[in-house]
Amino acid sequence: MNKENVITLDNPVKRGEQVIEQVTLMKPSAGTLRGVSLAAVANSEVDALIKVLPRMTAPMLTEQEVAALELPDLVALAGKVVGFLVAELGAVTFPKNLSVDDLMADVAVIFHWPPSELYPMSLTELITWREKALRRSGNTNE
């Protein structure tokens, strides 16, 4: 795993006898970001981070542990999450109401793919397939 994706927590997470001092972030896939707005993740909204960080951290933090993080630790983790999005998509502005679920639904409806085919896709792949789905459906206004 890339050492750049490792965050040393200023205030370690205590889980019973275990003390988590470092957290490794994994590059998110479409499945990782399901159920949240891309704009919310890109803007580091706390509710979105509480949802996605447990899906992309090792050791896996719980939603309760993420919610209890000290601000400097949450900001450090959020910076890595946003870094993944910027590296993957560039300077893309997401409409407030656009979610990964919306992208997946557009692709699934047109191409009849099950979610299991879509979850492993990167955001770039998912957006590319959504554009193809919109063109195929004749809806190019989005």
Swiss-Prot record:
Key words of the record: Late protein, Viral release from host cell, Viral tail assembly
Keyword Protease: no
This protein's record includes keyword Glycoprotein: no
A biological-process GO annotation: viral translational frameshifting
Coiled coil feature spans: none
Role according to the record: Promotes tail assembly by creating a scaffold for the tail tube proteins. Tail assembly proteins E and E' would wrap the linear tape measure protein to create a tail assembly scaffold.
Family label: Belongs to the mulikevirus tail assembly protein family.
Protein name: Tail assembly protein E'
Species: Escherichia phage P2 (Bacteriophage P2)
Lineage of origin: Viruses, Duplodnaviria, Heunggongvirae, Uroviricota, Caudoviricetes
Originating gene: E'
